[in-house]
């Protein structure tokens, strides 16, 4: 059964100074050391989050409760660097779902080139996130956005305006504390309890991305465009091996404090399934559901930052719209729209999001929403988040 969605542990950690590194305490981070030295600098940051939700498609608790927490470690030195991120979420009890999101180390080949090894986000799309919202676009649930896998990534800066990534990922990021193989952070292929259902494992993922800053002389407008491609093997338990071929093009237009981001792409997965050739089982955040194997997708996002909106308060309104248009005749298109705003003051943030979904697995839908669709029509969610950043 599809379980309710957890908006993306926090355990309190005591860090002692190591090898006489000096400590610098800032308003939002803790850091030790100097990144310009061989020993390097360690930075600790994160947040703790509570939420309140109101849904028109189910009985809401209408209670403010702990939702999630994040702990991040960042290491930077003259030659080496690294990153670790750990999160915990509450479904029924504190941290009943927790996961390692990133854990990697890197080496700086030169000022313009570096290589990263370990669990990390894949260089697919304009960045890790394609929208400004906390809830995320439905491409997150489809397994195309905010994907974290185990592999190696080479990044090269070509001149002042061009960035290139070439990466290889041997397997998915796996699950940790939670409901078995449905407990990864990123959406990946999983197996249903039905023994007759194909078991799909994605391996040997090759990903490439190029991003180009377009120089616009004497203009306050900044334009970045690019594209990415993803090819992988899909090993089926029936002994056959299929492939995924996915791509997208993207662009970001910036004018002063305003940003417009557009993404358009295509996902083609041939799982070699003898029972369900048109969709596969995906799992994340302790939920299992179906995703169409072949679809086009579109994500649009706009945000505007207003500094000192009121005294020391900063305000960022934003909006996003996602379309997952499946190829299979009779499969209904999935959409998600989000209108939101975030208010920040010092280390505290308040975010409010009004979300409308149709054929949306986590907004009033069911396990088949991202495949054939559902009969729920438009469903709505009000999501309020209270965040303490450190």
Spans of features found by a protein language model:
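Solvent-exposed loop segments that connect transmembrane elements
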Residues: 175-197, 237-239, 269-293, 360-376
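Detector for outer-membrane/organellar transmembrane beta-barrel domains
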Residues: 203, 211-214, 218-327, 335, ...
């Amino acid at each position: 059964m599809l379980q309710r969605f957890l908006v993306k542990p926090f355990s309190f950690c005591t860090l002692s100074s190591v090898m006489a590194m000096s400590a610098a305490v800032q308003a939002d981070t803790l850091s030790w050391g100097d990144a310009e030295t061989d020993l390097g600098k360690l930075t600790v940051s994160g947040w703790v989050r509570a939420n309140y939700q109101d849904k028109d498609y189910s009985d809401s608790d209408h209670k403010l409760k702990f939702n999630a927490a994040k702990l991040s470690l960042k290491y930077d030195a003259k030659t080496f660097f690294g990153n670790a991120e750990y999160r915990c979420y509450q479904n029924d009890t504190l941290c009943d779902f927790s996961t390692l999101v990133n854990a990697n180390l890197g080496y700086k080949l030169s000022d313009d080139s570096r290589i990263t090894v370990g669990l990390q986000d894949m260089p697919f799309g304009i960045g890790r996130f394609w929208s400004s919202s906390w809830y995320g676009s439905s491409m997150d649930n489809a397994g195309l956005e905010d994907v974290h896998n185990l592999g190696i990534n080479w990044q090269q800066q070509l001149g002042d305006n061009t960035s290139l990534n070439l990466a290889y990922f041997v397997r998915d990021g796996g699950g940790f504390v939670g409901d078995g193989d449905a407990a990864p952070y990123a959406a990946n292929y999983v197996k249903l309890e039905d023994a007759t259902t194909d078991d799909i494992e994605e391996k040997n993922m090759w990903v490439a991305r190029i991003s180009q800053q377009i120089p616009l002389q004497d203009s306050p407008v900044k334009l970045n465009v690019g594209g990415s491609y993803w090819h992988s093997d899909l090993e089926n338990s029936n002994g056959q091996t299929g492939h995924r071929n996915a791509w997208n093009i993207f662009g970001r237009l910036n004018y002063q404090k305003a940003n417009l981001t557009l993404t358009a792409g295509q996902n083609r997965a041939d799982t070699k399934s003898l029972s369900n050739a048109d969709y596969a089982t995906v799992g994340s955040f302790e939920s299992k559901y179906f995703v169409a194997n072949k679809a086009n997708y579109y994500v649009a996002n706009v945000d505007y930052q207003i500094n000192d909106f009121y005294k020391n308060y900063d305000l960022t309104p934003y909006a996003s719209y996602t379309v997952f248009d499946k190829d299979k005749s009779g499969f209904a298109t999935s959409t998600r729209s989000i209108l939101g705003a975030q208010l920040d003051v010092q280390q505290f943030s308040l975010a409010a999001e009004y979300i409308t979904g149709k054929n949306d697995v986590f907004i009033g839908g069911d396990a088949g929403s991202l495949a054939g669709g559902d009969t729920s029509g438009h469903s709505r969610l009000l999501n309020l988040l209270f965040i303490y950043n450190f």
